[in-house]
Amino acid sequence: MTQVTVKELAKVVDTPVERLLQQMREAGLSHDNAEQVVTDSEKQALLAHLKSSHGDKVEEPRKITLQRKTTSTLRVAGSKTISVEVRKKKTFVKRSPEELEAEKQRELEAQRAEAEAERLKAEEEAKRKAEEEAKRQAAAATSEAPAPAASPAPLSEPVVAAPVVEVERKKEEVRRPEKARSDEDERRDRKHAQHRPTLKEKAPAPRVAPRSVDEESDGFRRGGRGKAKMKKRNQHGFQAPAGPVVRDVAIGETITVADLAQQMSIKAAEVIKFMFKMGTPVTINQVLDQETAQLVAEEFGHKVKLVSDNALEEQLAESLKFEGEAMSRAPVVTVMGHVDHGKTSLLDYIRRAKVASGEAGGITQHIGAYHVETDRGMVTFLDTPGHAAFTAMRARGAKATDIVILVVAADDGVMPQTQEAVQHAKAAGVPIVVAVNKMDKPEANPDNIKNGLAALDVIPEEWGGDAPFVPVSAKAGTGIDELLEAVLLQAEVLELKATPTAPGRGVVVESRLDKGRGPVATVLVQDGTLRQGDMVLVGVNYGRVRAMLDENGKPIKEAGPSIPVEILGLDGTPDAGDEMMVVADEKKAREVALFRQGKFREVKLARAHAGKLENIFESMGQEEKKTLNIVLKADVRGSLEALQGSLSTLGNDEVQVRVVGGGVGGITESDANLALASNAVLFGFNVRADAGARKIVESEGLDMRYYNVIYDIIEDVKKALTGMLGSDVRENILGTAEVRDVFRSPKFGAVAGCMVIEGTVYRNRPIRVLREDVVIFEGELESLRRFKDDVAEVRNGMECGIGVKSYNDVKVGDKIEVFEKVQVARSL
């Protein structure tokens, strides 16, 4: 037996010694010193005292649950047996004295309430019997009185009420007295009540209430055992509105007929019928403009709420936070000018690279974006094409730029694309720095350039204007430093600012479809910082930036303001000029992209339908145009747009070009099938066909051509259209003879003696006989003689005799005109 002292016990139970001694004294132990020994029995006594003082008692189990499991076998068809296991569980609860006392009180209250209810019921029954007795006596007195012959006997209340009373009386006799229900009955009723649908509590009514004839006819019927039952009426009813329902109809910039009808809660046929009455035939999927839809909705009596179609985009713009300190950024400079004036060569010298030699035909066909570190700071350059077909590219270049370098060749002067570049720069409000190139040539004439540009309102600084003119030579490298100095001086004047800490924003310069990497977009970051992994929204496309490359193809992690980069990860190739912005989450980007796609589709459908309606009467009675169908594939989006724009301008009233399919990337099997189905020519601009496409082209004999210079495509298409035009029949007047006398011949009839006054008269050629310059006969020259000899031709100033086949009414003074018909090839 282990013995411990009071001190050791206090240490074990983590209690002060004085407190433990006090508790031991309260337990009836005689310990008063910390060194005294405590036995096990004394410990048990102390523990029992502490438990009783704290209220802990050894509780007996209050709930016992019994489970029973029985297994049986069920035989089914096909001599199969199924084992069925039935489990039952029963729980017995031992209630405390307090609960038993409360239960007794509830039973007593229930008995008192039941006795009170019985008393009220007895009083009500006695009262009812007294009323019935009074009614019976009144009915008997009425029946004994003499009734008029015309009035029929009453058959409602006495006839119906008396038998019912008898039946109820018999029921009362047989009905046993109600006993107080046991706990088991109440529990069972509560269990059933959980599974029964809740019914409305009916108001207390007298047991035998007389029914009227209306009640009998309206849903009441007699049951088989004399019980009154009510028919269930589960019929659904619709109550028409008291007045017309006025709805709020939200109308955007465009809305289809079906959507408008749905918002007004009417059938689309009613809207179409109304539009027909207004004189506008429409279909269910036709797009209406905002004014027309507003007029229709107001005519139907609804309230119109005009909403902006750009609400979703405005919310997106508001959600983006562009906070941070604005800092100076590098200028974006666009090099513009006429073709072959040396734009790319000038940029090459600045970049110390040879780009122009790599361009097909020596002309730029894409917008190139580069940033260059100079001694005076960083400058971003955009190189635009100068050919007329690249008008849209130059316009985009001017839109994204801060300063324009206008390159003009000193030996060539101001050309059409030079004028166009000036117009784009002025429309964008961008300052112009003129670089007079090719100053190393002996025929250079810079004064001619100044005069030509002054006529376009580009006044040199030395003439009091604001456009610096810098003579340069891209070949020799002279004047390049002065040109960069002039550009950076203009940039300082503009005070260009950007916020590097904000989310990235920019513009798409170019896009293409790379076979290994998917859609690739060249983006110029204009504000903020674009980072790898950002979710970007670009026009109708979106995606997460998987990788970013600089202009040399090296991967980078982020790009600040004025930096051009190539981004990978978009779901499609965006159009050049589309705005790029970094958004917070993919869901918002997808919503806006899908909204823009739907909006673009609706506008396109509306434009196409309007064009059809406008041209429907113009095309009536005209022959169908001959169409040259083309499937066009290009390497980048900008070149594709330039080609489509150039080809669409070719043609006239008889022939036209239709680009049935276009895209970025190589020629695929689906492109070849499209060309086969539409009888089109396949053109590839800087792209090639894959094996599947080549197989279809060879087997079906399709016309497929590759090009790398835009001039060649345009020239070939012009030739093809010229061949489709056919040829014109033109009449050439060979000679004219004047009739001086008329002779009679037994063989030819009337023979005209003539003098050739113009050209040469030939035999067996068609002729016209003119009298007072009016054609009176057209036929063939049958006989031509000079001095009684048949000749083949008679020249100017000679006399001859002319016999006209099947015509004898020749008179003196008539003119005989000899002509020929020639087929001449037509041109556009």
Curated annotation (Swiss-Prot):
Residues 362-366 are annotated as: G2. Residues 437-440 are annotated as: G4. Residues 473-475 are annotated as: G5. Residues 95-136, 166-188, 212-221 have a biased composition (Basic and acidic residues). Residues 222-235 have a biased composition (Basic residues). InterPro entries: DNA-bd_dom_put_sf, EF-G-like_DII, IF2_assoc_dom_bac, IF2_II, IF2_N, P-loop_NTPase, Small_GTP-bd, T_Tr_GTP-bd_dom. One of the essential components for the initiation of protein synthesis. Protects formylmethionyl-tRNA from spontaneous hydrolysis and promotes its binding to the 30S ribosomal subunits. Also involved in the hydrolysis of GTP during the formation of the 70S ribosomal complex. Coiled coil: none annotated. Residues 93-240 are annotated as: Disordered. Residues 137-165 have a biased composition (Low complexity). Residues 328-501 form the tr-type G domain. The gene is infB. The lineage of its organism: Bacteria, Pseudomonadati, Pseudomonadota, Gammaproteobacteria, Pseudomonadales. It comes from Ectopseudomonas mendocina (strain ymp) (Pseudomonas mendocina). This is Translation initiation factor IF-2. It is found in: Cytoplasm. Pfam families: EF-G_D2, GTP_EFTU, IF-2, IF2_assoc, IF2_N.
